[in-house]
Amino acid sequence: MSMFCYQCQEAAGGRGCTVKGVCGKTEDIAKTQDLIIYVVKGIAIYSSQAREIGLNTSEADKFIVESLFSTITNANFDAKTLNARVQEGLKIKQSLKDAIIKAGGSYNSKENKSWTSKFLSVLGIKNDKDEKEIHDAAVWAANNPEDFKKKAETVGVLATENEDIRSLRELLTYGLKGMAAYLEHANNLGYDEDSIHAFMEKALVATLDDTLSADELTALVLECGKYGVDVMALLDKANTSTYGNPEITKVNIGVRNNPGILISGHDLKDMEELLKQTEGTGVDVYTHSEMLPANYYPAFKKYKHFVGNYGNAWWKQNEEFEDFNGPILMTTNCIVTPKASYKDRIYTTGVTGFEGVKHINPSKDGKKDFSEIIEHAKRCASPKEIEKGEIIGGFAHNQVLALAPQVVDAVKTGAIKRFFVMAGCDGRMKSRNYYTDFAKELPKDTVILTAGCAKYKYNKLDLGDINGIPRVLDAGQCNDSYSLAVIALKLKEVFELEDINELPISYNIAWYEQKAVIVLLALLHLGVKNIHLGPTLPAFLSPNVAKILVENFGIGTISSVDEDIKMFMN
């Protein structure tokens, strides 16, 4: 069976990648990632039970989160580390099973497929012996890559035959992947929430349960949105408690003459460690793509060698990384196949990986040693200037709420007629130029609220301001879409409205990968309707599932700039 992947917006032909991923992943990588998800589901079966009887599940919790994150689009292309993850997962699964048995669980080793119902309350249907059949995901084991390959052939997306059940299972899984990404960053800063892990396990097990109806899976998808809000709130707390609340900041997009390191991705802990270790070395630090919002945090502003932001969204990295001249640290997605001309300057860390590039692992105390990349930078030329000037950002919820009187007055007087939430992701497709044109053509009495790398389609345009309020308010990274929700809820309260949809806010969101999926589900949980997704609707939505979203939530897509602006403004 050939590979099949349709988790990102660029799925081939709007249907799915079957030969090689548009992202660059090979068939082997795609299938290994399918197997990782299957192993994670097996672990979830046991960790759910272990949690119920009070056993420590921290190792499994961490593995589930990291594994889901490692399969996000453009995160990891390293076959060796992905296969090692499968092997590690099988060991964790066995360890959990042994711990449950030791704690009093009953396991029929001869039949190798039944546990007593006392310890399998989340599995299957009771048989006439008051036992439940255990899923293959819980019992499958192997110890070599060849067996991994054979198993991977049988556990991919298309293993679920019913199109609608498959669609809902994948929608739920992709929401969990996005949730895992945000939880990983919070965990790295010492913040966690057991209820989020418990839901993730419950949802993973549910994707194995053939007795669940489409309605039951739909309810789980919406529940996923609730935990999406929770995880974004947790990460917001982690980031702001550690580094302060983002504040209005002018960010330099030019360069200096010192050698530099470019840091990309989302992990602020890595950002902090890199700034500390480069201080006094003569090496400058620049952010790239989704790391741009690090410039807004007060804690990072004390570093004089933190220059600003270099370049644009992730998909332009082939050209921009070449021009940067120095080494690049990829802390998370998005990494694309590097050119030979700069591949030796790429370093990965965390769950990110690419075959043939250097990976920086943490030591036993959790800290990372960036000395190799720092010494590498010293041997490199300074960055080539590709832009100059400044961009402004830092409009997360705390900053915007500080401006609330000014914003509310502008709405009441009619100076601001409507807000447009244009959060989300950027990507390669030329049709995404729609978002640049949309921003340009919006009436001058409108304000764009953004988060994520979608901002690069318009954050360098001169769109002016309204009574001193910039017409593009950048809250931060994709997870800072949480800030946009907080702002909307506060405005609802200020204007004494019953329904969040009564606000003069329209949602025109560009999506790309699975973090955008959890943001969407979170917005649906908060009651937001009439969200428009583009440049295309997800390939993983079957016609019937798409119909549910359209009929119940008013989900739509984009058409032309003129038609859409007219529709939104009416």
Curated annotation (Swiss-Prot):
Keywords: 4Fe-4S, Cytoplasm, Iron, Iron-sulfur, Metal-binding, Oxidoreductase. [4Fe-4S] cluster binds at residues 5, 8, 17, 23. Hybrid [4Fe-2O-2S] cluster binds at residues 266, 290, 334, 425, 453, 478, 513, 515. It comes from the Bacteria. Disulfide bonds: none annotated. Its main location: cytoplasm. It is found in: Cytoplasm. This is Hydroxylamine reductase.
